Design a protein with these regions (language model features):
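FAD-site-proximal beta/loop scaffold in flavoenzymes
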Residues: 433-467, 552-629
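Flanking helices and flexible, charged tails adjoining ferredoxin-like Fe-S electron-transfer domains
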Residues: 2, 28-66, 84-86, 92-209, ...
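FAD-binding core/adjacent interface of flavoenzyme oxidoreductases
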Residues: 248, 273-274, 282-332, 347-348, ...
């Protein structure tokens, strides 16, 4: 008989560790570069409370092999294997497979064509340790079925039956003493613990952070809830930085904060930042195995706890083993992408100088995110840490004005551009440039500069909303930042108006909840048609249409459909437009041969020969300037990938990235 993977579905906890392990086993034990390459050869199906790992059965007289017109599927080493050289991607095997475990993967080729190939479990035939899914299953529900294994399994079941039959028929059922299974641990996990939070009536009076740090007992309790779902867990995969989450949570359990912070910094140079501002509910916590049973582990607050504790103890990155490789790189933009790139480069012995137009590092972390979400002293401390590591900062320096890109190309071996996106998207409705109408980003930047005691700028003035009736248009996290900022400046009323329903808001549920607690009003299913003006030309309201939810769009979100005859005017003294951002104009790029797309985004890809290299070989780019406005962690991940591309291009030999 052929060998195959056998699963005990009754004990499966649905952690998907087998899927992650499978993909990594076929990618040199590294995470794949993007989600579109995540093709596990084993899949965990969920049907209510039951989880079932499913993969190829390696059938005797396999229908897939019998159906293949090119002889690409055959028996080898007691298993059914696909010869990729012979496969023509015809899908005959997909149709023939009775279990639906065959898949066709289309891979783009360098010449512009594509190769379609059959894809299935190969039992990790070339892997010395055997199938990765079995090795990494934390619940031990997978095994490699062979004739000997099946014989032993049948024998053990017969022996158990014999033991039970030896008991008197009127006796109580005999249960054998065994250690708790992972499934039992999951069902016995205590409820999720949230951090303490300042009362709403207190926090609206200042710009201090509203969440209090975990106390040690809170952190230990929350860390104990982690099931440690494999060496490379699904929470690790869904984090764009692939943080070693279960491993540093385990160090918290052991009371080893310094060990935890070392693990944390292997993949993330700003953990005290991402622990505060990352939308964990959409990433790591959203994938947590115990989410449905008792609530996700509070990963973000544990990440914050580790860094806050370790940095308070005096921990700093150890650079004693780093020696210079004689290369110099300039980084344009001290935001998340630029800082992440600088971290990898300086740890690899490269001399790094970071240029930024702002007076402090962080980019929108510092000037776009309000202080009640992110204390600005954290970035100042992190600048001191980077400086001690050897990174040099040129702040208040605008590339293109204060220094030319061509000069930087002359002075440095390579350049990285991580300038973010600063141009606000418009709604395209009448009077959106009238007095009293503000774009979200200049509003937030002007406020942050005011809170930090910095002078206002002409393009980012401080807007005082005291006593005003403020309406914020939009439903993302930036809209919530504007709502909560206006409330703290004493606005008489603040309303968030969004064209879809609450369930389809793109922002964090936590931020919406906080805004409601602080007194914000919400109007859902309303779409702006026109801004109305007073006699003096200043905005005094928004003409709206009611909407209903229609069919899903290309991204799967239901479209808002205007309701005929539902028009009304919403009064407003100030209107803040929070519709997102596009890349701002960078004319100095084109002169150096850096191509951009129709939206103004720099064209660069993680799948290039040198990751995130642009059309100018000396220049690399990443973050929002490449992909458009996105998350802090995605920008950081791209900065790290670009650093690897730069190191490869400069022929600097470094160990594999964690």
């Amino acid at each position: 008989m052929n060998r195959f993977i056998m699963a005990n579905s009754q004990q499966c906890i649905g952690c998907h560790a087998c899927e992650v392990a499978c993909v990594m086993a076929h990618n040199d034990e590294q995470h794949v570069l993007s989600k579109r390459h995540f093709h596990p050869r084993i899949t965990v199906l969920n049907s209510g409370a039951q989880n079932s790992p499913v993969t190829c059965h390696h059938c005797e007289n396999a229908p897939c092999a019998l159906s293949c017109p090119n002889g690409a599927i055959s028996k080898r080493d007691d298993s059914v294997q696909v010869n990729q050289q012979k496969c023509i991607g015809c899908k005959a095997c997909v149709v023939a497979c009775p279990f639906g475990t065959m898949e066709i993967i289309v891979t783009p080729l360098d010449n512009g064509s594509a190769k379609a190939s059959a894809y299935k479990c190969d039992l990790c035939l070339t892997r010395p340790q055997g199938p990765a899914c079995i090795e990494n299953c934390p619940a031990d529900v997978l095994m490699l079925a062979t004739p000997d294994v099946l014989d032993n399994l049948a024998k053990s079941r017969r022996q158990r039956t014999a033991r039970l039959e030896a008991q008197p028929w009127h006796s109580e059922a005999v249960s054998e003493e065994t250690a708790p299974t992972k499934l039992q641990q999951m069902h016995n996990t205590p409820p999720r613990g949230e951090p303490d939070k300042l009362a709403a009536e207190e926090r609206v009076g200042h710009f201090n952070e509203i969440y209090l740090p975990f106390r040690t007992e809170q952190a230990r309790r929350e860390a104990s809830r982690c099931l440690k779902c494999g060496e490379h867990s699904i929470c690790e995969w869904t984090c764009p930085l692939h943080n070693h989450i279960p491993q540093w949570i385990e160090r918290i359990n052991a009371g080893d904060i310094l060990g935890a912070v070392e693990l944390s910094h292997q993949t993330n140079c700003l953990p005290e930042i991402t622990g505060r501002v990352c939308p964990q509910d959409r990433l790591c916590e959203g994938a947590c195995t115990v989410r449905d049973a008792s609530g996700s582990v509070t990963i973000g607050n544990l990440e914050r706890y580790i860094s806050d504790q370790a940095l308070a103890l005096g921990w700093r990155p150890d650079m004693s083993g780093v020696s210079s490789v004689g290369k110099r790189v300039a980084i344009i933009g001290a935001g998340p992408a630029g800082l992440a790139c600088a971290d990898v480069l300086v740890r690899s012995g490269v001399s790094v100088t970071v240029y930024d137009r702002h007076p402090e590092i962080g980019g929108l972390l510092t000037f776009g995110i309000p202080a009640f979400k992110l204390d600005k002293s954290l970035l100042a401390r992190r600048r001191e840490i980077f400086t001690a590591m050897g990174v040099h900062f040129e702040l208040n320096c605008d590339v293109g004005s204060d220094v030319s890109l061509s000069q930087l190309q002359t002075d440095y071996d390579a350049l990285f551009i991580g300038v973010g996106t600063y141009r606000s998207m418009k709604a395209g409705i009448p009077h959106e440039d009238a007095p009293g109408v503000y774009d979200a980003l200049p509003f937030l930047v002007g406020n942050t500069r005011h809170v930090m005691g910095l002078d206002a700028t002409a393009n980012e003035p401080f807007i005082d909303t005291r006593g005003l009736n403020v309406v914020v248009l939009g439903g993302g996290d930036t809209a919530m930042d504007c709502v909560r900022t206006a409330l703290r400046h004493g606005a008489a009323k603040v309303t968030c108006a969004y064209r879809r329903d609450e369930a389809n808001m793109p922002g964090s549920k936590k931020e919406v909840k906080n805004a409601k607690e602080e007194g914000a009003a919400f109007e859902f299913n309303v779409q702006p048609v026109e801004l109305t003006l007073a006699a003096d030309g200043k905005v005094n309201g928004i003409r709206m249409l009611r909407t209903r939810m229609g069919e899903p769009d290309a991204q799967g979100r239901r479209r808002p459909v205007p309701v005929e005859g539902s028009e009304f005017v919403m009064p407003a003294d100030a209107v803040i437009m929070a519709f997102g951002f596009n890349p701002h104009a960078m004319p100095w790029l084109e002169s150096q041969g850096v191509n951009t797309d129709d939206w103004g985004r720099i064209i660069a890809s993680v799948e290039s020969r040198y990751r995130y290299q642009t059309s100018n070989p000396q220049i690399f780019a990443g973050g929002d300037a490449v992909r458009g406005a996105d998350l802090v962690v995605t920008a950081m991940a791209e900065g790290r990938h670009a650093a690897r591309g730069i190191l490869d291009w400069l022929e600097v030999s470094v160990p594999k990235m964690h």
